[in-house]
């Protein structure tokens, strides 16, 4: 896997939910995409918007040299992306980041996959690859409300799936931490835990599995360069009494073991 840059072609784009879009891209760069949990850095085709936007990879299709991204419109850059049509091109840098480690689980073992909001997309490729290994996946997905929920059927097709919404309009009332607590209370202990979402959700997972050796968290930090040069996305390491040791989320991450970093 190498980091490369390419003008990739938009194959299709559609809206999944309010402010949530699915973007399919085609190009040679897909050959370099292998590990779930990686992301790409996209140049906004507007002269006044200089910083690239990091967007996680939702699906990889090597046979058609396509990849799928799912993003939420948050500002001027993603607003531009949402207006683009099939046939147009985007300047893509990637794949970036380390990706999830799926070597620690084997066929017949169980993995909890936990996602919240816009942290859900990269977990689909992860679940797909774990399925291919024969790992039993159990999904715990949280949304703000039924209105903004997406990709439910896709995850359900891969394995057991539990949903929660903040307002109780779909699935359990509350957050995914409640779903995890209920699963643990029933004696369901996973061989590995993979999660991506807001910092509060990741902290809850860290507290639920304080000594588990295989809890992997994908951190959502603001990024600028995406290649570890600017130090805009650092987080501190656990066990560092000086507070001076840090890791770069874009380059050394975005995935870390829960035992490694301070959330």
UniProtKB/Swiss-Prot annotation:
The keyword Transcription does not apply. GO terms for biological process: 'de novo' UMP biosynthetic process. Residues 3-102 form the FAD-binding FR-type domain. InterPro entries: Cbr1-like_FAD-bd_dom, Cyt_c3_hydrogenase_gsu, Dihydroorotate_DH_ele_sf, Dihydroorotate_DH_Fe-S-bd, Dihydroorotate_DHASE_ETsu, FAD-bd_FR_type, FNR_nucleotide-bd, PyrK_electron_transfer. It comes from the Bacteria. Binds 1 [2Fe-2S] cluster per subunit. Keywords: 2Fe-2S, Electron transport, FAD, Flavoprotein, Iron, Iron-sulfur, Metal-binding, Pyrimidine biosynthesis, Transport. FAD binds at residues 53-56, 70-72, 77-78. Coiled coil: none annotated. [2Fe-2S] cluster binds at residues 225, 230, 233, 250. Pathway: Pyrimidine metabolism; UMP biosynthesis via de novo pathway; orotate from (S)-dihydroorotate (NAD(+) route): step 1/1. GO terms for molecular function: 2 iron, 2 sulfur cluster binding; electron transfer activity; flavin adenine dinucleotide binding; metal ion binding; oxidoreductase activity. Signal peptide: none annotated. Its cofactor is [2Fe-2S] cluster; FAD. The keyword Electron transport applies. It holds the Pfam family DHODB_Fe-S_bind. Responsible for channeling the electrons from the oxidation of dihydroorotate from the FMN redox center in the PyrD type B subunit to the ultimate electron acceptor NAD(+). Heterotetramer of 2 PyrK and 2 PyrD type B subunits. Belongs to the PyrK family. This is Dihydroorotate dehydrogenase B (NAD(+)), electron transfer subunit. It comes from Enterococcus faecalis (strain ATCC 700802 / V583).
